[in-house]
């Protein structure tokens, strides 16, 4: 005899609600959140990658020194922008035309932008700050070398001169003196003078970046 046949109420238990529905809802929310997070990460990564590629590009090189393009009757100045401030340099274009032309060409081509001052010597006595090396360790060059231009200009305080590894090995590296360095006269070609930013020069540290170099022609 069934329980219904004896007049008693059915005692069939109600099935408890499955927890799977709640668990799936939670998992779904977590999955959506995870996908959103991954999407954000991918966006950031793809935004950064182009910049990383730019940083890893090989430095510019050239097969020969640039042709003469400056007008030696005009006055040329360069503004080197750094995070510490600007250095303004006046060139001796009429006296040292080949080297000034070389610097102007490289600067206008963006060669120096992003390079560093890889050598800063102030101790035991003020000496020089040197930059313009495409490798960043003082061994780089633009792919060519050219002869010295030794003139009556000497290494006074703030002199802009070409760094080299011996006679007639000029390329792209340059230095600016913190104090007179006349023992360098006749060995390095002075081609300009710092006219603004000595305080900036004194604050520079090894590794400071040359943001850009702008050439002004008058």
What residues fall within each predicted segment?
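Cyclophilin-like peptidyl-prolyl cis-trans isomerases
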Residues: 1-218
């Amino acid at each position: 005899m069934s329980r219904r046949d004896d007049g008693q109420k059915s005692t069939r238990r109600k099935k408890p609600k499955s927890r799977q529905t709640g668990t799936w809802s939670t998992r779904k929310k977590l999955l959506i959140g995870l996908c959103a997070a991954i999407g954000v990460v991918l966006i950031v990564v793809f935004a950064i990658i182009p910049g990383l590629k730019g940083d890893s590009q090989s430095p510019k090189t050239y097969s020969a020194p640039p042709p003469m393009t400056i007008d030696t009757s005009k006055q040329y100045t360069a503004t080197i922008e750094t995070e510490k401030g600007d250095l303004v340099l006046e060139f001796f274009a009429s006296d040292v035309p080949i080297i000034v032309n070389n610097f102007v060409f490289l600067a206008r081509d963006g060669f120096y932008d992003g390079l560093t001052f890889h050598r800063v010597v102030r101790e035991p006595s003020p000496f020089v700050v040197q930059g313009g090396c495409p490798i960043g360790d003082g061994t780089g060059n633009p792919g060519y070398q050219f002869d010295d231009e030794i003139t009556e200009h000497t290494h006074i305080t703030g002199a802009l001169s070409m760094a080299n590894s011996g006679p007639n090995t000029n390329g792209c590296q340059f230095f600016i003196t913190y104090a007179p360095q006349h023992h360098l006269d006749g060995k390095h070609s002075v081609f300009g003078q710092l006219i603004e930013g000595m305080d900036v020069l004194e604050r520079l540290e090894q590794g400071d970046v040359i943001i850009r170099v702008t050439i002004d022609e008058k």
